[in-house]
Structures are given as structure tokens and as C-alpha cells.
UniProtKB/Swiss-Prot annotation:
Pfam families, A to Z: TRAPP (PF04051)
A GO biological process held by the record: COPII vesicle coating
Main localization category: Golgi
Family membership noted in the UniProt record: Belongs to the TRAPP small subunits family. BET3 subfamily.
Database matches in InterPro entries: NO_sig/Golgi_transp_ligand-bd, TRAPP-I_su5, TRAPP_component
GO cellular component, one term: cytosol
Domain of life, source organism: Eukaryota
Its job: May play a role in vesicular transport from endoplasmic reticulum to Golgi.
Entries under SUPFAM superfamilies matching the protein: Ligand-binding domain in the NO signalling and Golgi transport
Residue numbers carrying Phosphoserine: 10
Name of protein: Trafficking protein particle complex subunit 5
Amino acid sequence: MEARFTRGKSALLERALARPRTEVSLSAFALLFSELVQHCQSRVFSVAELQSRLAALGRQVGARVLDALVAREKGARRETKVLGALLFVKGAVWKALFGKEADKLEQANDDARTFYIIEREPLINTYISVPKENSTLNCASFTAGIVEAVLTHSGFPAKVTAHWHKGTTLMIKFEEAVIARDRALEGR
């Protein structure tokens, strides 16, 4: 009876707590996310409502993702500039969620408050089939909610929406106070 408890240490017990293994089965993720979309779809009457419900769920996830990333980061420093926060989202947050960086980060030519994160083939839309009557549905609204929460909880309040353009584009529109603060920091 005691022989089963006297084996050598398990590889699981040897892992460091600071950097847990973050891989999730793609099929498990696809199943859970499609069930989440179906659950939300059964409780709404329009595509806009469905996208806002997915964004609200994404905001809940985003707050927790930010907490986890900040807790794991060694020598964590708080970003004070908009570009630094956006690069954190494009790099560290995207890697933690999807295993790779986002494809592109761009700023709008005509508006200093607007930035775009472009993902050509978003993982979140890969296994979702959309009927023709809901052709405007973009399930990346969930990702937009995550990004909005990460930025807002980092001290950069913004509104993030998902659009179909060059794949999926997340449009990030910061509040005017954020841009004014960024300009004031540049002047120092």
C-alpha cells in the first residue's frame, strides 16, 4: 500500500510556480468558445447585442489576464506612455492568449487617439461558422473586450471595437485625457 507513495518526485512538482505551463488544447478552446458564442446567441436578438455581450465577457477575462501577467512579470514596471501600453498588448498579452504576437500595430493618420491592432487570421474566428443572416458578426469582439479591459485597468481608458478589415482589426480609441497626459509626459 505504501509503495505507491514512495516514488520519485513528479515532474509536475518540479515546475516553478512563477511560470506555469500555459498551453491549452486548441480543440478544447474551440469547443468552449463555440459553446460560449451559442450561449450568448440564444439570449440576444441582434448581432450588435451578441457582439456587446461577447465584449462584456472579454472585459472580465481581460482584467484577470492583466493581473496574472503583472504578477508573473519579474521586475514589472508600469507603462506610462500609450505606445508602451499598446506594445505590451501586442506582445506580452497576445502571446499569453494566442501563443504569438499580433500581426500589426498601426496609428490612424487623421486621429491621434485611434490605433489599430491587425490580426490577419485570428484564432478566435477560426472555428466559428457564421450564418449568412449574421454575416456582420465578428466574434473577435471577445478579444476587443479583453484588450479594452487590459488598457483600462492599466490606466489608459479606451473603447475597443472589432471590425472586418485586412482580417480582423481592433480599433482602439483612447479618451482625450490619455492623449493629453501622453503629450505632457513627452514634454518633460
